[in-house]
């Protein structure tokens, strides 16, 4: 019997590349599955998930509020901030404070990104969000095309090199708000119609094995991930991957699962999510 094709969507960034290194390089047995890696920015993947286009996909925890009828969350593959996370940056000389952001032009990586939900929970609704490819946000802030930028991915480590300063760290804000919960950002999810026999638990175990392989073979996984770092040297790539691929990526933990539910609950109560969220994890 031919291997079953699984289209696996993830972002072209170092942490996702690190997670799926073992699968991309055929370093572990794939248990009757064949993977096609499809790399797109997270907002594109969020949109595709509304259509159920991919069998397994990275998506924003925020977006999952609208996707739970099509997808279940995998119990691993999460990106979470531990007192750090997406941040808002402005030009170094700009006299801008967080409470001014609702009335300013703010570059964001997407309306369904977790970072945008968290920003609005922190400061209120942003009246003029400017949707911008995540890898251009630092540039448009530096150029003065917007007043501020919401930075995800490796820009969190490099913004100062472009003459920018941080005015808000959403990981710090969330930690204080919730009494220490990690900040939910990205998740991996599997389409519900694969729930036949043992398909879902087998897939889940295999994807966890890929993450574990990367953590156990860090040098090779980092070399693979570095090519997606958009100018990061190996030391910075290692630092960035360490922020978002770690033991919690192997399993959310009870507090990680609680954090997902808490974020979506707060978003719904604030009127930022228009449906009561269902949080449904695959158990493997």
Regions found by a protein language model. Name each.
Residues 3-25, 39, 86-148, 153-157, ...:
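Bilobed "Venus flytrap"/periplasmic-binding protein-like clamshell domains
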Residues 195-266:
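Secondary-structure end/capping motifs
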Residues 135-226:
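Pocket-lining segment of extracytoplasmic ligand-binding domains
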Residues 266-284:
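Conserved C-terminal helix/tail region of periplasmic/extracytoplasmic solute-binding proteins
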Residues 15-18, 28-60:
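Extracytoplasmic small-molecule ligand-binding "clamshell" domains
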Residues 6-7, 70-79, 105:
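A structural signal for short loop-to-beta-strand junctions that line the ligand-binding cleft
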Residues 73-96, 176-193:
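Hydrophobic/proline-rich hinge and linker segments of small-molecule sensing/allosteric domains
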Residues 41-43, 52-65, 133-134, 151-157:
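Beta->alpha turn/N-cap motifs
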């Amino acid at each position: 019997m031919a291997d079953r094709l699984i289209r696996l969507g993830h972002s072209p960034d170092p942490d996702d590349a690190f997670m799926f290194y073992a699968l991309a390089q055929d370093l572990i047995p794939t248990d009757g599955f064949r993977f096609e890696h499809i790399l797109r920015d997270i907002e594109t993947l969020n949109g595709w998930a509304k259509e159920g286009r991919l069998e397994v996909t990275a998506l924003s925890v925020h977006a999952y509020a609208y996707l739970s009828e099509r997808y279940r969350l995998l119990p691993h593959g999460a990106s979470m901030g531990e007192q750090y996370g997406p941040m808002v940056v402005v030009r170094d000389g700009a006299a801008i404070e967080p409470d001014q952001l609702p009335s300013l032009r703010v570059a964001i990586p997407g309306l369904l990104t977790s970072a945008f939900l968290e920003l609005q929970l922190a400061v209120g609704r942003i009246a003029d969000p400017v949707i911008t490819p995540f890898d251009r946000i630092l540039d448009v802030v530096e150029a003065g095309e917007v007043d501020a930028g919401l930075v995800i991915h490796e820009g969190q480590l490099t913004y100062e090199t472009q003459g920018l300063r941080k005015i808000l760290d959403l990981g710090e804000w969330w930690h204080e708000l919730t009494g220490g919960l990690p900040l939910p950002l990205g998740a991996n999810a599997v389409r519900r119609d694969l729930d036949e026999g043992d398909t879902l638990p087998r897939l889940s175990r295999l994807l966890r094995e890929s993450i574990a392989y990367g953590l156990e073979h860090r040098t090779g996984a980092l070399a693979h991930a570095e090519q997606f770092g958009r100018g990061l040297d190996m030391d910075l790539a290692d630092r960035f991957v360490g922020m978002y691929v770690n033991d919690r990526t192997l399993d959310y933990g009870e507090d990680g699962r609680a954090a997902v539910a808490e974020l979506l609950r707060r978003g719904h109560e604030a009127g930022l999510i228009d449906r009561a969220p269902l949080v449904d994890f695959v158990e493997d």
